[in-house]
């Protein structure tokens, strides 16, 4: 039975990869295809929870062929998602955009993060991997009156995000940095690392200079089948810079864990 299930899963993953790649190409020529692309993203998110996979989940997540196919699909899906977000920003910046609808549609996952990390009104938050569509930043401003620093390695995404923030008149509350060193001498209260940030373990050491002893870091990630649409993360127990401050929490979009600076480092 497992052999048949594995073959079916590999076929589904390969099919999704081909569909997303083709729709991504089409959307770059005709923007109406972004709607179809969004539906495929929803399919990716629901794939992880399909009932027929659950009995074989551990085997699938440790099968080299499945892991390889998931990595290939994630690369294609993430590239498409980045362009989809850029398309959404352009739409949101238009005069006819309904920004309130956009904000209210945000997933409840962030509310869990706010509670788990103990975020308070008016605090400073660094968002790593903010992307072209900085939903998290906008919600933190709306809910907590936070000051959010957005950092992303993609200059085009940063520029589009700036345009969106400017169109909303939130330049003071949502600021953009091109280098983490811009936060020197002004540490943040919290850090949120986006699920699509790839090398999370290496990033942690870079973030230490910009936090206080009481800061919390929210690490978003997805392992196993959930890594189809998220980059994986496994906390190293012997990490000298950070320690876990919560158990892993599962949300509809990704998993998350709260880290805090290791005071003994």
UniProtKB/Swiss-Prot annotation:
Domain of life (superkingdom): Bacteria
GO MF assignments: nicotianamine synthase activity
Keywords, alphabetical: S-adenosyl-L-methionine, Transferase
Organism: Yersinia pestis
EC number, as in UniProt: 2.5.1.-
GO biological process terms on file: nicotianamine biosynthetic process
Source lineage: Bacteria, Pseudomonadati, Pseudomonadota, Gammaproteobacteria, Enterobacterales
InterPro entries (alphabetical): NAD(P)-bd_dom_sf, Nicotian_synth, SAM-dependent_MTases_sf
Function of the protein: Catalyzes the nucleophilic attack of one alpha-aminobutanoate moiety from SAM onto L-histidine to produce the intermediate (2S)-2-amino-4-{[(1S)-1-carboxy-2-(1H-imidazol-4-yl)ethyl]amino}butanoate. Functions in the biosynthesis of the metallophore yersinopine, which is involved in metal acquisition and thus enables bacterial growth inside the host, where metal access is limited. Therefore, this enzyme probably contributes to Yersinia virulence.
Presence of the UniProt keyword Transferase in the record: yes
The family this protein is said to belong to: Belongs to the methyltransferase superfamily. CntL family.
Catalytic reaction list: L-histidine + S-adenosyl-L-methionine = (2S)-2-amino-4-{[(1S)-1-carboxy-2-(1H-imidazol-4-yl)ethyl]amino}butanoate + S-methyl-5'-thioadenosine + H(+)
Protein name: L-histidine 2-aminobutanoyltransferase
Keyword Transferase attached: yes
Coiled coil: none
């Amino acid at each position: 039975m497992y052999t048949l299930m594995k073959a079916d899963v590999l076929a589904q993953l390969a099919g999704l990869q081909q569909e997303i790649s083709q729709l991504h190409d089409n959307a770059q020529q005709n923007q109406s295809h972004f709607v179809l692309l969004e539906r495929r993203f929803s399919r990716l998110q629901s794939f992880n929870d399909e009932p027929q996979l659950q009995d074989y989940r551990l085997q699938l997540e440790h099968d080299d062929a499945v892991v390889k196919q998931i990595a290939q699909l994630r690369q294609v899906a993430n590239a498409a998602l980045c362009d989809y977000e850029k398309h959404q920003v352009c739409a949101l910046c238009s005069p006819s955009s309904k920004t309130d609808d956009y904000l209210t549609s945000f997933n409840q996952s962030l509310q869990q993060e706010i509670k788990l990390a103990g975020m308070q009104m008016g605090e400073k938050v660094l968002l790593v991997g903010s992307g072209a569509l900085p939903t998290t930043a906008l919600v933190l401003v709306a809910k907590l009156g936070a000051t959010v620093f957005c950092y992303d390695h993609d200059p085009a995404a940063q520029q589009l995000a700036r345009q969106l923030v400017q169109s909303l008149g939130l330049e003071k509350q949502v600021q953009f940095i091109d280098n983490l060193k811009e936060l020197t001498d002004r540490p943040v209260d919290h850090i949120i690392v986006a699920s699509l940030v790839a090398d999370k373990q290496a990033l942690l050491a870079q973030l230490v200079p910009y936090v206080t002893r009481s800061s919390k870091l929210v690490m978003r990630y997805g392992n196993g089948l959930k890594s189809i649409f998220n980059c994986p993360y496994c906390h190293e127990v012997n990490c000298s810079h950070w320690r876990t401050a919560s158990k892993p929490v599962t949300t509809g979009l990704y998993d998350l864990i709260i880290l805090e600076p290791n005071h003994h480092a």
